[in-house]
């Protein structure tokens, strides 16, 4: 059975900091001004952008970020696996994008901010979700809890309002679902590299902090990584403590940058940077001093 948990409010509107069950995905993603102190909330995804390029963050905040079609399949699997629904999804009555009618329907839906999927994608996503649900670890994790819990809190140090959208919240864990596009990429080592590249440990730090602030309960963080390629292997994992601590430090730095830039109103790039060229570039072309042993 699934049931709401302590500190989670059943509501379709946000009125104050807390954890909410029932907020539509489009409302959460709208980033609308929802009244003090909840105006312009910061999220994990926003933190990633502001750490790398504050000006890009400022632009994306005022403009709809272009969608990536490779994410559409992930959103579909996510909705089917968690049985949560997603009001952004728009199913086109076709099994591919080859016909002009299907392409026009897709483009029209995307212009409206929808995620367009065809019936072939729906069939494939259902197979992925079914394979994941057959894994006993996934079955156990999803045996209790709620999908799509929206969490809002105010950071005490900076005064910045923060938000997170929890894929699945159960009594012991904050659970995140990741779809992996290639065969074997959900295995521990390759997934670990992806986790570092996409700042997943920061996500773990942000989500667990937000849930604790909103509900008063400290939970762990677990990730369900499922491969889109057959046979859809599943990897259930936790990030090491040191990585989550590093992610927390990155989150704190992002909040500080946000608070400073928001106060000054200065989002433009400053100065001239040095391109971080990988150390392996030109290694065989440059003479290096011999080291005496």
Regions found by a protein language model. Give the residues of each.
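Secondary-structure boundary elements
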Residues: 137-143, 170-176, 211-219
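Short histidine-centered catalytic/ligand-binding loop motif
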Residues: 64-66, 110-117, 186-198, 240-242
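A residue-level signal for conserved active-site and pocket-lining positions in enzyme catalytic cores
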Residues: 77-78, 168, 251
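Metal-dependent nuclease catalytic regions and adjoining charged, substrate-binding loops involved
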Residues: 9-12, 17-21, 194-201, 206-293
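Hydrophobic/aromatic-lined pockets within catalytic cores
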Residues: 81-85, 155, 179-182, 212-216, ...
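Conserved catalytic cores of phosphodiester-cleaving nucleases, focusing on short active-site segments
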Residues: 164-193, 207
């Amino acid at each position: 059975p699934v049931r709401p948990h302590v500190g989670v409010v059943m509501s379709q509107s946000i009125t104050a900091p807390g954890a909410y069950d029932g907020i539509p995905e489009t409302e959460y993603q709208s980033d609308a001004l929802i009244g003090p102190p909840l105006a312009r909330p910061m999220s994990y995804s926003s933190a990633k952008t502001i750490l790398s390029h504050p000006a890009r963050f400022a632009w994306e905040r005022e403009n709809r970020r272009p969608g990536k079609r490779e994410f559409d399949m992930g959103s579909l699997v996510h909705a089917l696996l968690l049985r949560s629904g997603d009001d952004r999804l728009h199913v086109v009555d076709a099994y591919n994008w080859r016909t002009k009618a299907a392409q026009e329907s897709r483009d029209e839906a995307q212009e409206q901010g929808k995620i367009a999927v065809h019936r072939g994608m729906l069939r494939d996503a259902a197979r992925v979700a079914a394979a994941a649900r057959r894994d006993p670890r996934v079955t156990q994790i999803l045996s209790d809890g709620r999908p799509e819990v929206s969490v809002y809190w105010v950071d005490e140090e900076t005064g910045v309002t923060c938000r997170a959208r929890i894929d699945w919240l159960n009594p012991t864990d904050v659970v995140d679902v990741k779809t992996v596009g290639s065969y074997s990429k959900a295995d521990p080592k390759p997934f670990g590299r992806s986790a570092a590249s996409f700042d997943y440990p920061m996500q773990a730090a942000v989500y667990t902090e937000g849930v604790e602030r909103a509900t008063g309960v400290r939970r762990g963080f677990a990730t369900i990584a499922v491969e889109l390629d057959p046979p859809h292997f599943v990897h259930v994992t936790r990030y090491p403590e040191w990585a989550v601590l590093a992610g927390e430090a990155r989150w704190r730095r992002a909040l500080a940058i946000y608070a400073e830039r928001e106060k000054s109103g200065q989002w433009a790039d400053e100065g001239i940077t040095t391109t971080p060229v990988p150390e392996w570039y030109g290694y065989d072309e440059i003479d290096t001093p011999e080291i005496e042993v």
